[in-house]
């Protein structure tokens, strides 16, 4: 593989660059994400029992749902999902951070995890992927196989609406929380549909990829920040929109990271086969390559892309190496990080600005803090809560 070293680019060691040092899809948590035991306690005490009890009169249903939740969650690294907690704890007034509201914050984090998992369960069926995170996909091990897994995945995405009704219906921001989750569900399915249709075209383009990424990942990831801001008591639509814009870009970076790992990491390293290679997916890597390839490289690429033949997959990887894909990836991430930094500086809210800046620093610049970055957010964060 081509080395990431490039004299013209700064040394970056954030979460989306971990694969260069570890050669695999492993994410180190944000340095302030230290209370995951409390989060998982809420999952065990509240989320799993609530979801099981929706149809407790149906024989074997509660047991199936419990197994589904424990087997599939989290579908991706739960480090991505710290957005909701970071924003709430940093932005909400100390008086708002009661035990009840902290629990609700964890329920919002769980809401995002459930939506992520819905995406993964259905995506694995669509991609015909047998594995996720190094173990068999839910559709491979559940009773009923793909036929029932489809409905399991659909339920997973609807459980958040039930949780919101159970715990937020008397909150002033309830209707906005509900609307955000519904629109996230809709936009995600739009993005997934566009993504699958692109596999039939087998002609990856950046214009197509931007549409996929916006709906499938950008708006999806941004929903976590929107839910957290609303729960924190911010009612300014301008502030909410500006926050969503920043985290939409962050979500697009994360999706590009995932696309890049399909090229850069082996199936043993990232826990599943390279579905994008085999399905001719319109990913950032394939779309960027088509922008950069010479005519002869493009022809050779199209002859090999979308095949499970190992020699053809190797040819595609070699073509990516020829155009120095790691450098192109780094340039893309840095460009979008700079966009976010500009938007963050324009945020007219000090604590929200600190939360956004801290997340982007962790995502792109460094996985461990310098003294200044740790101190600034710690001043805003209710560390003892």
Swiss-Prot record:
It comes from the Eukaryota. Binds 2 Mg(2+) ions per subunit. The lineage of its organism: Eukaryota, Metazoa, Ecdysozoa, Arthropoda, Hexapoda. The Asp-Asp-Xaa-Xaa-Asp/Glu (DDXXD/E) motif is important for the catalytic activity, presumably through binding to Mg(2+). Its EC number is 2.5.1.-. A motif (DDXXD motif) lies at residues 123-127. One of its GO terms (cellular component) is cytoplasm. Pfam families: polyprenyl_synt. Keywords: Isoprene biosynthesis, Magnesium, Metal-binding, Transferase. GO terms for molecular function: (2E,6E)-farnesyl diphosphate synthase activity; dimethylallyltranstransferase activity; metal ion binding; sesquiterpene synthase activity. Specifically expressed in tissues lining the cuticle of the abdominal sternites of mature males. Its cofactor is Mg(2+). Pathway: Pheromone biosynthesis. InterPro entries: FPS1-like, Isoprenoid_synthase_dom_sf, Polyprenyl_synt. Mg(2+) 2 binds at residues 123, 127. This is Sesquiterpene alcohol synthase.
